[in-house]
Every structure is written in C-alpha cells, then in structure tokens.
C-alpha cells in the first residue's frame, strides 16, 4: 500500500520505510527520512484497505510537503526571537512569554500542515486508485474516538481535556471533516 502511494506521490523516487508498531495507541506518524509508523491500535478501527491507505497517504504528505524542515525552521526562529528578547531586556519573564508565544505560532502552523497533509494524501490516494473519501472515514473515526475519550473522562470525574488543545499540532477533527 505504502509503495503504491509513494509511486503516485509528488516524490516517487524517494525511499520510504513503513513500520507497524505494537502499540494500543490510536496513532500514526512520519519522521524525517521517509519513516512512517502506524500503531496497531489504529488498525483496530480501520475497516478497509482504502482507510489504511488514507492514514499512510496523510503521513506521506507530511514528508512530501517538507513539514519536518519547515517546523524545524519555525522552532529555531522562535528560539532566536525569545533569546534576543532576553538579551535586550534581561527579563526571564519576557523570554518565557516569547517562548510560549512561539510555541503557539508553531502549533498554529502545525494545524495548517495537517490540513496540507490531508490534501496531499487525498491526491496521492486518487492517483493510486483509492477512494479519497476513505480519508474522511478515518478522520470520522478519530473524531468518534475523541468524543468517546471525553465522555469517559467526564464519567470518571476527570478533566475532559482533549487531544486537540491549545498547543496541539492537529486541528479539531470536525474542522478536518469540513475541509
């Protein structure tokens, strides 16, 4: 599945490695160098090959869109600005505030990158002969799991915080479904 998607991506000559992790967590992620990981826990919620292709295509999208290098540049810029503010003012509080602001800015770009990866992944799926709507199905599964975690937390008296908090790199799943 992965190699078929790569062959129909914007970087068909790059080398990608796909690994299934024995983890119950509902997650998948990409690392620089074309390394893509899917957790066993996510597979339990997928019903079709096309849905798995959607997960993998989204992660390929992070790599083809150079999200890792863009995020690194943004983080470096944020650190330089915070350090400059500290040097100019001598205020540790200003440094901390600048770092927090920088983290939020980087996080905001991350949300945009998630939507870019969704769009790139949908294109790679289409070119590979998969129904790109399967990616929407996966996002729907993630939204359902997010709601389930909230209900469980509330029922057990725990805070109903969500994975998609202030500094999360992912947009809300309902926003992703609308896009």
For every predicted segment, state its role.
Residues 1-179:
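A Zn2+-metalloprotease active-site environment signal
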């Amino acid at each position: 599945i992965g190699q078929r998607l790569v062959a129909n991506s914007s970087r068909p000559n790059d080398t990608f490695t796909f690994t299934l992790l024995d983890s119950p967590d509902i997650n998948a992620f990409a690392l620089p160098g074309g390394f893509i990981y899917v957790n066993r826990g996510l597979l339990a919620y997928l019903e079709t090959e096309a849905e798995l292709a959607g997960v993998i295509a989204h992660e390929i999208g992070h790599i083809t869109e150079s999200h890792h290098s863009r995020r690194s540049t943004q983080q470096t810029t944020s650190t330089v600005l915070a350090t400059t503010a500290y040097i100019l003012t001598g205020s540790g509080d200003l440094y901390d505030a600048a770092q927090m602001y920088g983290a939020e800015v980087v996080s905001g770009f991350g949300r945009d990158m998630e939507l870019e990866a969704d769009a790139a992944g949908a294109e790679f799926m289409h070119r590979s002969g998969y129904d790109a709507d399967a990616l929407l199905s996966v996002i729907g599964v993630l939204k359902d799991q997010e709601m389930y975690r909230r209900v469980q937390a509330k029922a057990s008296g725990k805070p109903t915080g969500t994975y998609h908090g202030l500094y999360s790199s992912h947009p809300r799943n309902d926003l992703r479904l609308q896009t």
